[in-house]
Amino acid sequence: MNDLIVRLSSLTLENIKNVKKGTVCVPITGITKAGVLGIYGQNGSGKTAIIDALYFLQQIMIGSELEPEIADYLDSDSDHAEITAEFIISSSEKALYEVGYHVQLAKADSRVWINREFLNCSVTKNGIRSNKNIFMD
């Protein structure tokens, strides 16, 4: 599996900063070309929430300890927040992988912890797509 290219295809946030629930879909214009040049929108539309959520997601996925400041980014009216990221991974073997990662963060007082997470994947090879299987829950 050489020459893997990983692209974010969608990001769903729930109770992150000012976003109660929202999904951003990233159009994949070409697997080998850059697709996103910037994020724009009205003030308060969730642009910073997207960037912050991607940072939290990165920290969680590499196994870093959750920073205490993350509690400030979770909606104060809710005891949990959720981030779901969908990725498209292409390989030189002409296989296409659709990978999803979901994490639910729980909050009490100023503490935040991972309450639940799961990872799923499907493979498309030779035009045949497998069902999405959950690998971790």
Residue ranges and their predicted role:
Residues 38-40, 51-110:
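Conserved P-loop NTP-binding catalytic core
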Residues 14-16, 86-92, 120-122:
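A generic structural motif
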Residues 1-56:
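Pre-Walker A-like glycine/lysine-rich segment at the N-terminus of P-loop NTPase domains
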Residues 20, 93-97, 128:
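Short acidic/polar mixed-charge low-complexity motifs
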Residues 102-137:
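Electropositive, glycine-dotted interaction segments
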